[in-house]
Every structure is written in structure tokens, then in C-alpha cells.
A protein has these predicted regions:
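Rossmann-like dinucleotide-binding domain that binds NAD(P)(H)
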Residues: 153-229, 296, 300
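NAD(P)-dinucleotide binding in Rossmann-like oxidoreductases
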Residues: 203, 214-281, 290-296
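Beta-strand-loop-alpha-helix segment that lines the small-molecule cofactor/substrate pocket
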Residues: 71-76, 80, 84-131
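N-terminal Rossmann-like dinucleotide-binding module
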Residues: 1-52
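C-terminal helix-rich "cap/oligomerization" subdomain common to oxidoreductases
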Residues: 26, 46, 73-75, 282-327
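Rossmann-like NAD(P)H-binding beta-loop-alpha module
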Residues: 136-152
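A short helix-to-beta-strand connector/capping loop
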Residues: 49-59, 122-124
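Short acidic low-complexity segments
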Residues: 54-70
Length: 327
């Protein structure tokens, strides 16, 4: 029987828990969550799902050190400000085979190399939860996008949390590259000169337009301030054009080999986290692979992103945080 742990079962962690009710192999679930209200919410969400007889047990712990000594998969769903401490404690006290981390990976640039070395030394497989890689809608276009000489990727919307969520879009563009280690450039000059505190204590949000390149792809991410406006994603390449409103579940596409005639896509576009983690867990536990980006691949984008956003926030506020205050 496999042992899966989730560290932090708050808003996102509880969705991972829900998704694990779909696993297709025998597991024991171990959950680290010191706050009883969060434990209650997590169990309420867990019990909303169909019962799975393959889940032999579910146990809550207040501390990482109380987990089983050997774990097949650990999902770290904490906020970024405590993630280094959490992961170091996990690696110091337990033998772990596989890990899934949330974004933003770490707030300190130095932490990325620290864990690159630690994961390699301990021979641990690590992935980062950028779930658009699991949306089957985009799979049908990947071959065309990866074979294109250039890809143009645009996101527009209001109050979608650029500092918090831009990495999901950048990873999406990275997925469309044929290179394993594409060169990345990020330009923050079109961001607004205003930085505001986010809902998470000690974290900030930015607005305006973030431009740059990833490999042969260019991107432009725009987030306006004030009104929540659903995001639209526009992707253009040599052979395909795609326009998506994920919030409304609407998409159109046109392909060169169909004379650029626009077609409506009428199937499901977005999958929720509560629908995805079970699939990922089964892939990892059975094959030691999954469709999420590896830690090393994700770090290629995360490192320059937190550098640029940290510079923007510190310059705007006239403060030296010594880290990138986003999560």
C-alpha cells in the first residue's frame, strides 16, 4: 500500500485531497494541518466525494515529524513564505520518493539552487503544480505549436493576480517550446508604478503588462486594476491561432491546413484541481512520471520571474525585502 501525504490542507490542499479520492490503487493518506478549522473544512470536502474503498485510512497530524518515516508521494500545499522550512524539515526527517510543490516555489532566489542540490543528492523526483499542462484541450495543438518558428502568447484580464498567477501562464508558454532549456527574458517596464498589498499577509500584487520571451515564444500578460474581468488567452503560431475564455468555457481556433477557418470548440476546457491530482498521483506512483513540469524545468521560469518582480516591488515601495514577497 502506498503512502501519500499532503502538507497543508487549506483552500488548495483540500482540493488535492478531494482529487485523491479517484486514485486507482491502495493508499493511506496522511495530512499535516495544525489548525482544526482547516481540518474540518478538508474533511467536509473529502466527504463530498464518492467513497473509494482503495483509501484504507486518512490521518491528521499537527507536525511533519509525525508522518510515516517513508512516503511514496508528498504534496506540499503551503504558502511560499514557509516552503523552504517545510521542505527542509521533510527531507531531514523522512525518506520521500516523490514530491509535488505549489507555485511560487520559493521567495528567495538562493533557495532554488539549494533544493536543486538536495533533491539530486536524495534522488527525489519533484514536480511543480502548473495544471494547464493537464488540460486536454491544449494537447491537440501542441505538435503545431512546438514545430512553429514562433509562438505569440497573450493574456488579458482584470484583477487576476499577476504576481500570484503569472507563472501558470509562463509555464503554459514554456510547454509549447521544443527546447528543453529555453532562454527567458522578462520585461517589467510596462507594469504600473503602483504596488498593492494582496490578500495574503506580507505579499503584494502588481498591475499592468508583463512582456518577454521564452525560447521562440513571445508573451504579453496584462492585468488591469479595479474590476474583475475574466482572462482571455490568445495564442498565435505559424500553423494555428487559438482564442480561449477559460472562465466561460469558450474557445475558437483556426488552422493553416484548414484555410484559417475559425472553428468553435464545444467540449470541456478547464479541469479543476479536485479533478486532476488523482490522475497525477496514479501516474507518479505507477510510472514515476507525470505531465506536470519537473522542478528543474519550472525553476527555469520561476527564478528570473521572482528576480524581476522583487526588483519591481522593492523599487516601487522603496524597501529592501531581501526576498520576493509573493505567494
Amino acid at each position: 500500500m502506498k503512502k501519500i501525504a499532503i502538507i497543508g490542507v487549506g483552500q488548495l490542499g483540500s482540493r488535492h485531497l478531494q482529487a485523491l479520492t479517484t486514485v486507482k490503487q491502495a493508499i493511506a493518506l496522511e495530512l499535516v494541518e495544525p489548525y482544526e478549522p482547516m481540518q474540518k473544512i478538508a474533511m467536509e470536502r473529502y466527504e463530498q466525494m464518492p467513497k473509494n474503498e482503495l483509501i484504507h485510512s486518512i490521518t491528521f497530524f499537527d507536525d511533519i515529524t509525525a508522518l510515516s518515516n517513508e512516503l511514496d508521494l508528498v504534496i506540499v500545499a503551503t504558502t511560499a513564505n514557509v516552503r523552504r522550512t517545510v521542505v527542509d524539515t521533510l527531507l531531514d526527517t523522512k525518506k520521500v520518493k516523490n514530491i509535488i510543490l505549489e507555485k511560487v516555489l520559493f521567495q528567495n532566489y538562493e533557495d532554488y539552487d539549494h533544493f536543486t542540490n538536495r533533491f539530486a543528492e536524495l534522488n527525489i523526483n519533484v514536480w511543480v503544480n502548473h495544471p494547464r499542462r493537464l488540460f486536454s484541450f491544449y494537447d491537440q495543438f501542441l505538435s503545431d505549436l512546438k514545430n512553429s518558428s514562433q509562438v505569440s502568447y497573450h493574456v488579458q484580464g482584470g484583477e487576476w493576480g499577476m504576481a500570484c498567477n503569472a507563472l501558470h501562464f509562463l509555464d503554459h508558454l514554456q510547454m509549447m517550446q521544443s527546447e528543453d532549456k529555453p532562454t527567458i527574458q522578462i520585461d517589467t517596464t510596462m507594469l504600473m508604478t503602483e504596488v498593492v498589498e494582496s490578500k495574503r499577509k506580507g505579499c503584494y500584487e502588481v498591475y499592468g503588462t508583463l512582456n518577454g520571451t521564452i525560447g521562440n515564444g513571445s508573451f504579453s500578460l496584462t492585468c488591469t486594476k479595479g474590476e474583475i474581468i475574466p482572462t482571455t488567452i490568445s495564442i498565435m503560431s505559424d500553423d494555428v491561432r487559438i482564442i480561449v475564455d477559460e472562465y466561460k468555457g469558450i474557445a475558437m481556433f483556426a488552422k493553416r491546413d484548414n484555410e484559417w477557418k475559425w472553428e468553435n470548440y464545444e467540449d470541456k476546457i478547464v479541469s479543476f484541481q479536485s479533478e486532476l491530482t488523482g490522475i497525477v498521483a496514479d501516474d507518479i506512483l505507477t510510472h514515476q512520471i507525470c505531465k506536470l513540469p519537473t522542478y528543474l524545468d519550472a525553476a527555469i521560469v520561476h527564478k528570473p520571474f521572482i528576480q524581476k518582480i522583487q526588483e519591481k516591488i522593492e523599487t516601487t515601495l522603496g524597501k529592501d525585502f531581501g526576498l520576493c514577497p509573493i505567494s
